[in-house]
Amino acid sequence: MRIINSISYCPPLGFRGLGDLYLPDNVTPETRAVLTIHGGGWSAQEKNTFSGVAIWLCSELNMAVYNINYRLSSIAPWPACGDDCLEAGRFFLDADIPEFQGFDRKRIFVMGGSAGGHLALMTGLRLPPERIAGIVSISGIADVEADFPVDPMRYKILLGHTPAKEDFAEISPATYLTPASPAILCTHEHHDNVVPIASAERFLEAVQKNGSAGEACFYDKDENGYSHRIWIPDSVPHKLYQELENRIAKFLFEHA
């Protein structure tokens, strides 16, 4: 595996406009590509917190991975983070730079966790559907109205004000569903106390009503404390539970 750090998709953003490219040793024109997006309630963390997922996708699934930063809502409110991820997606699909040659960018996957799951959905559903192979939301904020009562403050920080009904429509992934939308996988632990599983359940209901392809991976983990229950405890960098990796890999291979 080879890592090319700090490829800028938007130079004016500085550090927040950077992504790291992970390339498998055996890159071919058939090597599939994934855009990955970290979580942190839209207001914290950076790309290194999702590097364990990027390493797994690259080293074990032989995929090319562009793992990105974006502007945090604590510094720049919505739509900044959404716009940044969308720009990163366009850049990964179409930028004519040497680092992005040699692998398949005709159709990419988009993947994220927690708030990054929301941003993955918002990105994948707003890019041209014929260019997106699939979207993976790992314990993501898929339905914002189901999630809002759990932590209203993160929405006030995201938007820069207390949200109104029209705000929910703008930041809701379901708003951007069409019959041509790409396949979507939502994974969620039943007792996630950071983002409730109802967020994934309600979103997948909307996907089903829309007539597009939605898949669920709901599971149980014996963990305590405030947690999504997605990471193997004490893993550095964070590594997903094996059953999660297996289910995500199945989705990626089926939709490649």
Show which residues each predicted segment covers.
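Conserved alpha/beta-hydrolase "acid-adjacent" motif
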Residues: 193-202
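Primarily recognizes the serine-hydrolase "nucleophile elbow" in alpha/beta-hydrolase
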Residues: 87-150
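Short beta-strand/loop motif that positions the catalytic acidic residue
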Residues: 180, 186-188, 192
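Mobile cap/lid helix-loop segments that gate and shape the active-site cleft of serine hydrolases
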Residues: 140-176
